[in-house]
Amino acid sequence: MVSAYSAKSIECHGYNIVRILDGRKKDVNVVINKESHIIVIPHIVKDNFKIYSKIYPVEIKNKTAIFYKAVHKNKDSEYYSDYSNSFTYKIGETKEEECADNKSGSCSRGIHIAHKSWAISFGSSWDNMALLECEVDIKDIVVCKDTDGKVRASKIKVIREIPKEEYYDFK
Protein backbone atom coordinates (compact mmCIF):
# COMPACT_ATOMS: atom_id res chain seq x y z
CA MET A 1 0.00 0.00 0.00
CA VAL A 2 1.27 3.44 -0.90
CA SER A 3 0.14 6.82 0.39
CA ALA A 4 0.71 9.48 -2.23
CA TYR A 5 -0.65 12.73 -0.90
CA SER A 6 -1.01 15.43 -3.58
CA ALA A 7 0.64 13.18 -6.17
CA LYS A 8 0.28 14.28 -9.75
CA SER A 9 0.97 10.77 -11.05
CA ILE A 10 1.44 7.24 -9.78
CA GLU A 11 3.22 4.53 -11.77
CA CYS A 12 2.09 0.96 -11.16
CA HIS A 13 3.31 -2.34 -12.59
CA GLY A 14 1.58 -5.71 -12.57
CA TYR A 15 -1.75 -6.24 -10.84
CA ASN A 16 -2.84 -3.24 -8.80
CA ILE A 17 -5.88 -2.21 -6.83
CA VAL A 18 -6.21 1.55 -6.80
CA ARG A 19 -8.42 3.53 -4.43
CA ILE A 20 -8.27 7.28 -4.58
CA LEU A 21 -9.75 9.60 -1.98
CA ASP A 22 -10.11 13.33 -2.32
CA GLY A 23 -9.28 15.85 0.41
CA ARG A 24 -12.61 15.16 2.12
CA LYS A 25 -11.89 11.42 2.26
CA LYS A 26 -14.51 10.69 -0.42
CA ASP A 27 -13.92 8.22 -3.24
CA VAL A 28 -12.93 9.82 -6.53
CA ASN A 29 -14.12 8.42 -9.86
CA VAL A 30 -11.21 6.99 -11.83
CA VAL A 31 -10.83 5.78 -15.41
CA ILE A 32 -7.66 4.07 -16.63
CA ASN A 33 -7.39 4.88 -20.33
CA LYS A 34 -5.84 2.75 -23.06
CA GLU A 35 -2.37 4.18 -22.40
CA SER A 36 -2.73 3.06 -18.74
CA HIS A 37 -2.68 6.58 -17.38
CA ILE A 38 -4.98 7.28 -14.47
CA ILE A 39 -7.48 10.04 -15.15
CA VAL A 40 -9.45 11.57 -12.28
CA ILE A 41 -13.00 12.51 -13.27
CA PRO A 42 -14.65 15.31 -11.26
CA HIS A 43 -18.23 14.43 -10.18
CA ILE A 44 -19.61 17.76 -11.35
CA VAL A 45 -18.85 17.24 -15.04
CA LYS A 46 -19.25 13.49 -15.45
CA ASP A 47 -22.97 13.48 -16.17
CA ASN A 48 -23.07 15.05 -19.61
CA PHE A 49 -22.56 13.44 -23.00
CA LYS A 50 -19.81 15.79 -24.16
CA ILE A 51 -17.58 14.77 -21.24
CA TYR A 52 -18.67 11.10 -21.50
CA SER A 53 -17.60 10.99 -25.16
CA LYS A 54 -14.13 12.29 -24.26
CA ILE A 55 -13.63 9.68 -21.54
CA TYR A 56 -15.16 6.60 -23.16
CA PRO A 57 -14.69 5.25 -26.70
CA VAL A 58 -17.87 6.22 -28.54
CA GLU A 59 -18.27 6.99 -32.23
CA ILE A 60 -20.21 10.19 -32.98
CA LYS A 61 -21.90 10.81 -36.34
CA ASN A 62 -23.51 14.27 -36.56
CA LYS A 63 -26.25 14.21 -33.89
CA THR A 64 -26.11 10.46 -33.25
CA ALA A 65 -23.74 8.13 -31.44
CA ILE A 66 -22.94 4.45 -31.88
CA PHE A 67 -23.44 2.33 -28.77
CA TYR A 68 -23.61 -1.39 -28.08
CA LYS A 69 -26.03 -3.66 -26.25
CA ALA A 70 -25.27 -7.16 -24.98
CA VAL A 71 -28.37 -9.30 -25.47
CA HIS A 72 -29.30 -12.97 -25.44
CA LYS A 73 -29.84 -14.77 -28.76
CA ASN A 74 -32.03 -17.85 -28.80
CA LYS A 75 -31.88 -20.83 -31.19
CA ASP A 76 -34.38 -19.06 -33.49
CA SER A 77 -31.92 -16.14 -33.79
CA GLU A 78 -34.19 -13.81 -31.81
CA TYR A 79 -32.54 -11.19 -29.61
CA TYR A 80 -33.87 -10.39 -26.15
CA SER A 81 -32.92 -8.29 -23.15
CA ASP A 82 -31.14 -9.70 -20.10
CA TYR A 83 -33.53 -7.75 -17.88
CA SER A 84 -36.72 -9.02 -19.56
CA ASN A 85 -36.91 -11.79 -22.14
CA SER A 86 -40.16 -10.26 -23.42
CA PHE A 87 -38.24 -7.14 -24.53
CA THR A 88 -36.96 -8.22 -27.95
CA TYR A 89 -34.77 -6.59 -30.58
CA LYS A 90 -34.68 -6.92 -34.38
CA ILE A 91 -32.04 -5.69 -36.81
CA GLY A 92 -33.22 -2.44 -38.43
CA GLU A 93 -35.87 -1.87 -35.78
CA THR A 94 -36.19 1.23 -33.60
CA LYS A 95 -37.00 0.45 -29.96
CA GLU A 96 -38.51 2.96 -27.56
CA GLU A 97 -38.85 2.76 -23.80
CA GLU A 98 -39.71 5.26 -21.11
CA CYS A 99 -36.45 6.63 -19.77
CA ALA A 100 -36.03 8.27 -16.37
CA ASP A 101 -34.33 11.63 -16.84
CA ASN A 102 -32.67 11.58 -13.43
CA LYS A 103 -28.88 11.48 -13.52
CA SER A 104 -28.38 9.92 -10.12
CA GLY A 105 -28.86 6.25 -10.97
CA SER A 106 -27.36 4.45 -13.95
CA CYS A 107 -29.68 1.47 -13.41
CA SER A 108 -32.87 3.55 -13.60
CA ARG A 109 -35.54 3.02 -16.24
CA GLY A 110 -34.50 3.16 -19.90
CA ILE A 111 -32.71 1.11 -22.53
CA HIS A 112 -29.24 0.40 -21.16
CA ILE A 113 -26.42 0.69 -23.71
CA ALA A 114 -22.68 1.22 -23.47
CA HIS A 115 -19.40 1.52 -25.30
CA LYS A 116 -18.28 -1.73 -26.92
CA SER A 117 -15.88 -3.13 -24.30
CA TRP A 118 -18.37 -2.46 -21.46
CA ALA A 119 -21.15 -4.30 -23.33
CA ILE A 120 -18.85 -7.24 -24.14
CA SER A 121 -17.79 -7.49 -20.50
CA PHE A 122 -21.41 -7.32 -19.30
CA GLY A 123 -22.54 -10.28 -21.41
CA SER A 124 -19.32 -12.27 -21.45
CA SER A 125 -20.52 -14.97 -19.04
CA TRP A 126 -23.59 -15.87 -21.14
CA ASP A 127 -23.47 -18.85 -23.50
CA ASN A 128 -25.95 -17.15 -25.85
CA MET A 129 -24.61 -13.60 -25.91
CA ALA A 130 -24.96 -11.44 -29.00
CA LEU A 131 -23.64 -7.91 -29.34
CA LEU A 132 -25.88 -5.39 -31.10
CA GLU A 133 -24.60 -2.15 -32.62
CA CYS A 134 -27.12 0.64 -32.04
CA GLU A 135 -27.49 4.18 -33.32
CA VAL A 136 -28.81 6.66 -30.77
CA ASP A 137 -29.78 10.32 -31.05
CA ILE A 138 -27.57 12.17 -28.58
CA LYS A 139 -30.62 14.06 -27.27
CA ASP A 140 -32.12 10.69 -26.17
CA ILE A 141 -29.12 9.72 -24.00
CA VAL A 142 -29.00 10.06 -20.21
CA VAL A 143 -25.49 9.98 -18.71
CA CYS A 144 -25.56 9.40 -14.96
CA LYS A 145 -23.12 10.68 -12.37
CA ASP A 146 -22.28 7.10 -11.36
CA THR A 147 -21.64 5.87 -14.90
CA ASP A 148 -18.91 3.33 -15.41
CA GLY A 149 -19.45 3.36 -19.17
CA LYS A 150 -23.14 2.47 -19.34
CA VAL A 151 -25.78 5.04 -20.30
CA ARG A 152 -29.56 4.95 -20.73
CA ALA A 153 -31.66 5.98 -23.71
CA SER A 154 -35.33 6.40 -24.55
CA LYS A 155 -34.90 5.28 -28.16
CA ILE A 156 -32.33 3.26 -30.11
CA LYS A 157 -32.08 1.89 -33.64
CA VAL A 158 -30.54 -1.58 -33.94
CA ILE A 159 -28.06 -1.49 -36.82
CA ARG A 160 -26.55 -4.99 -36.82
CA GLU A 161 -25.21 -7.88 -34.79
CA ILE A 162 -21.46 -7.55 -34.34
CA PRO A 163 -19.59 -10.71 -35.44
CA LYS A 164 -17.37 -12.15 -32.70
CA GLU A 165 -14.33 -11.43 -34.90
CA GLU A 166 -15.05 -7.70 -34.44
CA TYR A 167 -15.52 -7.77 -30.66
CA TYR A 168 -12.03 -6.48 -29.98
CA ASP A 169 -11.60 -4.45 -33.15
CA PHE A 170 -11.58 -0.95 -31.65
CA LYS A 171 -11.41 2.02 -34.00
Located regions from the model:
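Short, glycine-biased loop/turn motifs at secondary-structure junctions and
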Residues: 1-171
